[in-house]
Amino acid sequence: MAKTGVFDSDPTAIAKAKELKREMKKLLIKIDDEDDLGVQTIDQLQDALSALREATMRKMAKSSSLEMLETVSCPEEFRCPLSNELMRDPVVLASGQTYDKLFIQKWLSSGNRTCPKTQQVLPHTALTPNLLIREMISKWCKKNGLETKSQYHPNLVNEDETVTRSDREIFNSLLCKVSSSNLQDQKSAAKELRLLTRKGTEFRALFGESPDEITRLVNPLLHGSNPDEKLQEDVVTTLLNISIHDDSNKKLVCENPNVIPLLIDALRRGTVATRSNAAAAIFTLSALDSNKVLIGKSGILKPLIDLLEEGNPLAIKDVAAAIFTLCIAHENRSRAVRDGAVRVLGKKISNGLYVDELLAILAMLVTHWKAVEELGELGGVSWLLKITRESECKRNKENAIVILHTICFSDRTKWKEIKEEENAHGTITKLSREGTSRAQRKANGILDRLRKAMNLTHTA
């Protein structure tokens, strides 16, 4: 078996080494062919040899550090749950879990909308630096003679993010094709842009350089009432990929006057894949607070709620994530209630469908008085009590008791039903002892209210 070379595990280094070797081969052929050897040719050969030597030494140094790291027992709390390697740039996800930034970004860029460790649906995809863990890792590395650099996983550090002249030429050529009047050119270019923005960040970054590039991308969908289905899917998915890149791209995409109307149309008339990706794009764009308000004003909640009611399993999680994130902004909650969210959510939850995701949305909406009123009319107390009593998920129990707490303090006609449940099963008392800290507070609040109601009855 051939011995593994120093470049074998690093695709970027392999490419550089091959390029240097090709250059040296050309120079050697030139030397062999020339009778009168020039000094410039010799200098070029020396430069190529020096560059190859430097690249080799740099790779060997990285390999040495990796070998040393493998021999040292790394504390579990310093390891990324995704890679099981020492974290280089620890960040906190919305779920409260800490990951290495590179690995969690790859997870999110793949379209995932849950925490890998807890499976919790994420309200947003913002990442917060974990400075405490970073400092602890730094001290641990110094103590063990390790450098705190990207060498912990050099193979995954994307050195190809730099936009090359070739990337720019390809990008401009595809934008010219996608904004042309020829449907086949539009479709082939949109498909290629979708693939390029999914694979690498450099093409996402190129879209972020100017608002005009976004307009050119969506241009073929702005004309005509019946867009080609595949073209629509590829353009919408490209918008999703661009939005994942960073906050600057999210702002640029959302503020383009053509994008949100296009996404609304995709939610209403696209294929299942298009509608799902349109919802995912809305979820991603809504990570910015300013975008939540802007998107909410557009009327997008109604088609999202309609799609939720349809209940297509391929789209429903993206739709739920989009509604949840939008409703973090208080002004969007009244819009969601007005557009029929409570009825749709109540029907799904009472039938045991997607309870985890939908109950979290409902727990936010009950801060609006009309949501409480609708839940009462829908018989919501009975199935909320059932979830509180029977669910094995602590988060679902918490959300159910949060909603019941709001109902209890807003509608005294429901006290009797809650009291009967408590007398028969001790459901709320049990939760006040065994639930999450928030669930315990809400359960105790309900019990206090019921006791006061009993005292008033006896006093009267």
UniProtKB/Swiss-Prot annotation:
Catalysed reactions listed for this entry: S-ubiquitinyl-[E2 ubiquitin-conjugating enzyme]-L-cysteine + [acceptor protein]-L-lysine = [E2 ubiquitin-conjugating enzyme]-L-cysteine + N(6)-ubiquitinyl-[acceptor protein]-L-lysine
Domain U-box: 73-147
Post-translational modification remark: Phosphorylated by SD1-6 and SD1-7.
Effect of inactivating the gene: Reduced abscisic acid (ABA) sensitivity during seed germination.
UniProt entry tagged with the keyword Repeat: yes
Pathway assignment: Protein modification; protein ubiquitination
GO terms for cellular component: nucleus; plasma membrane
Molecular-function GO term, any one: ubiquitin-protein transferase activity
Enzyme Commission number(s) from the entry: 2.3.2.27
Subcellular location(s) of the protein: Nucleus; Cell membrane
InterPro entries in UniProt: ARM-like, ARM-type_fold, RING-Ubox_PUB, Ubox_domain, Znf_RING/FYVE/PHD
Sorted UniProt keywords: Abscisic acid signaling pathway, Cell membrane, Membrane, Nucleus, Phosphoprotein, Repeat, Transferase, Ubl conjugation pathway
CDD domains according to UniProt: RING-Ubox_PUB
Gene3D superfamilies: Leucine-rich Repeat Variant, Zinc/RING finger domain, C3HC4 (zinc finger)
ARM repeat start-end pairs: 201-244, 248-287, 289-328
Gene Ontology terms: biological process: abscisic acid-activated signaling pathway; cellular response to abscisic acid stimulus; lateral root development; protein ubiquitination
Entry keyword Cytoplasm: no
Top-rank lineage group of the source organism: Eukaryota
Role played: Functions as an E3 ubiquitin ligase. May be involved in the abscisic acid-mediated signaling pathway, at least during germination.
Subunit field text: Binds to SD11, SD16, SD17, SD18, SD113, SD129 and SD25.
Protein name per Swiss-Prot or TrEMBL: U-box domain-containing protein 9
Organism this protein belongs to: Arabidopsis thaliana
Gene: PUB9
